[in-house]
Amino acid sequence: MLSTILYLSIMWLCGWFMLWNIRTLSDKTPYEPHSVSVIIPARNEEANLKNLLPTLSNQSMKLQEVIVVNDDSDDRTEEVAREFGVTVVKPERLPIDWLGKPWACWNGAKHATGSLLLFLDADLEIERDGIERLCGEWERNRGMISVQPFHQMKSAREKLSSLFNIIVMAAMQCFTLFRKKPAGAFGPCLMIDRKTYTEIGGHEGIKHQVLEHMEMGRVAMNQDVNVTCFSGYKAVYFRMYSEGLTVLFFGWCKSFALGSAKTPLLPLVLTVAWITGGISLAIQLPFLLVQEINEVLMWGIFYLLFAIQIKTLMKKIGTNSILSALSHPFHFLFFSLVYIWSFILSMIKKEVKWKGREISVSEKGDA
């Protein structure tokens, strides 16, 4: 019994070590005015643009421009963008050695006129002072500012994403107890000044990378550019995989198939240990009916400790109710299923399908 207590204690502590301090955007505004060009790569994003663009038109600071890059959409993406009065860019046919999102971002950057470039995914929503706070952080830190949006989850089904959001934050390794440099940059929201963007090669330098901004962050740090990562808590939001359980399952399978090989060793060890502890709890629960009271009490205490931990960690990451935290055994088992299938995608099939395009999964991320 003592060995089990020690084992579960170590696994539980790993959860705190992997997300010791999650940095959020400061409320401090910039000292100087900045011209910001917002660039939105959009492939079949008609519905999402209707949510994002109104939040951009209502910002506390005046934007230089908003550019929507139509990445070969077959819905009303372009029409919706024009209805909101933003600039629409339609790139030439996708070159054979480029992936879609880097190509869209690169073309948007070429048309931009601002001194700061802000790349946003179409499924985001920004608080009224969100971009001003991003500018403030860029002014204080320089280089590249990267934000993982706060995940708004409304249904119980959507809250199955909780563990995945925790792992995504932990994988960046800059929020661990050891405060290491970021593993790269988050994909959905990235701000960089034009001069630095040009010097590091922009999206042309990572044109074949599936996780383009993760790789761009690495390229930037290799050239001694500062990369600072934040949670989007109370500033930048998104809502993913609200369409149903199937979309949620395969969406996270795709993300983990593409990202697992890029995770540094330290956060990988911490997250594997933590997940292992959670799965151990989930597997053990049915057997508590036939165990002695001391065993039941021990497992019950760790069940509550994991629930409290998940609720605490999720505060700055995404929506999470007490009921959702208490149902963590189902979350850990669901995570296991997704991880197994993502392993099959990455190691056996070696490709995933996303927005109608087949994407090869390889060490270099080549398409």
Mark where each language-model region is.
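N-terminal membrane-anchoring/stem segments of glycan-assembly enzymes
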Residues: 1-32, 175, 335
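Cell-envelope/extracellular polymer assembly enzymes that use nucleotide-activated donors
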Residues: 34-37, 65
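Short, acidic, metal-binding catalytic loop of nucleotide-sugar glycosyltransferases
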Residues: 54-63
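A conserved acidic beta->alpha catalytic loop
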Residues: 62, 70-78, 93, 124
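Acidic donor-binding/catalytic loop of UDP-sugar-dependent glycosyltransferases
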Residues: 76, 122-137
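Short aromatic/hydrophobic "clamp" motif used to bind/position activated sugar donors
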Residues: 105, 117
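Catalytic donor/gating beta->alpha subdomain of glycosyltransferases that bind UDP-sugars
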Residues: 138, 144-146, 150-156, 161-169, ...
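Membrane-embedded multi-pass helical conduit in multi-pass membrane proteins
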Residues: 273-349
